[in-house]
């Protein structure tokens, strides 16, 4: 108990939010952190690599993406994920999704796979009608 109290005090002092978890929940908790930290950076780097291959310098690519990243996170903080969600799937523009997928064929296969996986996750967790959105999305993605 003293150790837990000390840990909570340290977490608060560092600006964190103390959370008590069952040991069995810790791997999923850490997976959530990996999604929003390490994997977020992987997505940003993927965007930078695409832009550099299109002729941007790394610095210019980073500077081009940073305002979008900052605005997205700011909007998420203010309005939540669903209200912040933008892009072709959010507006039902599956022709653009198809064009994106075709364009990604020139990059490592993982880029295309990540785009498809994240598109499906977005539809599942952000769409107002997830089942219908996933059905339409899967029709487009299955053509690849």
Question: Over which residues does each language-model region extend?
Answer:
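NAD(P)-dependent Rossmann-like dehydrogenase/reductase catalytic/cofactor-binding core
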Residues: 62-144
């Amino acid at each position: 108990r003293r150790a837990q109290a000390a840990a909570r005090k340290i977490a608060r002092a560092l600006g964190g939010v103390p959370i008590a978890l069952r040991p069995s929940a810790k791997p999923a908790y850490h997976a959530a952190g990996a999604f929003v930290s390490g994997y977020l950076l992987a997505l940003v780097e993927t965007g930078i690599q695409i832009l550099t291959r299109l002729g941007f310098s790394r610095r210019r690519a980073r500077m081009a993406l940073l305002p979008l990243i900052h605005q997205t996170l700011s909007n998420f903080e203010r309005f939540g994920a669903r209200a912040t969600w933008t892009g072709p799937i959010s507006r039902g523009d599956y022709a653009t999704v198809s064009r994106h997928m075709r364009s990604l064929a020139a990059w490592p296969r993982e880029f295309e796979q990540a785009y498809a996986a994240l598109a499906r996750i977005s539809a599942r967790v952000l769409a107002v009608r997830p089942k219908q959105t996933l059905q339409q999305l899967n029709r487009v993605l299955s053509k690849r």
